[in-house]
């Protein structure tokens, strides 16, 4: 615990907490000051000027990061017949129908990171709403995980597709890579994410859309990014 405290304090000294950095400067700094013995994940935390309590101010979607996230996601696909074969050929880790519902319900099995379903299977998948929903695993058309084009969905996920959505405090939390990516690749991933979030701005949103942006590694301090420069 003391080691972590010293490491964190040392990293914190290198961050100007009164400054709003440009994205490339901030992400290079996050990468440079990371000191853990593992390859830390870098996350972006974006506070938006919307009210998630209103249906017309929801912000949700997905974007393929140009350099991926540094993690290979395990994909479970609910499909039957030809679509099940397509999913297997595309590299899905698990493919099935009712038997997977029973496995999840009966064994509390969650050895997967994302769920894709063909539209005709949503009646079956809906039975898992109470267990998949709280874990953020429920397939959704807005994120491209309810589709008949299962091969495309799997390809995008394996290539580094990430989902983004508001939490109850109107903040989006999304990984943009690993510290080993370095500043340039992290910045390119971050830019792709921000472009998608800006395009997803609800028509009902009033005032400043990007309220605050912070990036940080798993064990490191937050570095603030200038939201005005990001929106340009």
From Swiss-Prot:
CC terms in the record's Gene Ontology section: large ribosomal subunit
GO molecular function (one): structural constituent of ribosome
Keywords of this entry: Repressor, Ribonucleoprotein, Ribosomal protein, RNA-binding, rRNA-binding, Translation regulation, tRNA-binding
Disulfide feature: none
The UniProt record lists the keyword Oxidoreductase: no
Gene Ontology biological process: regulation of translation; translation
Superkingdom, natural source: Bacteria
Pfam families: Ribosomal_L1
HAMAP family for the chain: Ribosomal_uL1_B
Family per similarity comment: Belongs to the universal ribosomal protein uL1 family.
NCBIfam families documented for this protein: rplA_bact
PANTHER family hit by this protein: 54S RIBOSOMAL PROTEIN L1, MITOCHONDRIAL (PTHR36427), LARGE RIBOSOMAL SUBUNIT PROTEIN UL1M (PTHR36427:SF3)
Function: Binds directly to 23S rRNA. The L1 stalk is quite mobile in the ribosome, and is involved in E site tRNA release. Protein L1 is also a translational repressor protein, it controls the translation of the L11 operon by binding to its mRNA.
Oligomeric form and interacting partners: Part of the 50S ribosomal subunit.
The protein's name in its UniProt record: Large ribosomal subunit protein uL1
Organism: Clostridioides difficile (strain 630) (Peptoclostridium difficile)
């Amino acid at each position: 615990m003391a080691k972590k405290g010293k490491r964190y304090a040392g990293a914190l000294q290198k961050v100007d907490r009164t400054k709003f950095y440009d994205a490339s400067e901030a992400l290079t700094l996050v990468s440079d000051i990371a000191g853990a013995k593992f390859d830390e994940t870098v996350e972006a935390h974006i506070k938006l000027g919307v009210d998630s309590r209103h249906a017309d101010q929801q912000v949700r979607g997905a974007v393929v990061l140009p350099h991926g996230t540094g993690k290979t996601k395990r994909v479970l696909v609910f499909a039957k017949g030809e679509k099940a074969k397509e999913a297997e050929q595309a590299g899905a880790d698990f493919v099935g129908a009712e038997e997977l519902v029973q496995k999840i319900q009966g064994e509390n099995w969650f050895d997967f990171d994302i769920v894709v379903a063909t539209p005709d299977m949503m009646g079956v998948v809906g039975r898992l709403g109470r267990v998949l929903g709280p874990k953020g695993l429920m397939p959704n058309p807005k994120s491209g995980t309810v589709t008949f084009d299962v091969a495309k969905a799997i390809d995008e996920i394996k290539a580094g597709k990430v989902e983004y959505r508001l939490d109850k405090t109107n903040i989006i939390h999304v990984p943009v890579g690993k510290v080993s990516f370095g500043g340039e690749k992290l910045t390119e991933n971050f830019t792709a994410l921000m472009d998608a979030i800006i395009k997803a701005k609800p028509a009902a949103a009033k005032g400043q859309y990007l309220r605050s942006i912070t990036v940080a590694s798993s064990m490191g301090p937050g570095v603030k990014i200038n939201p005005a420069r990001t929106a340009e």
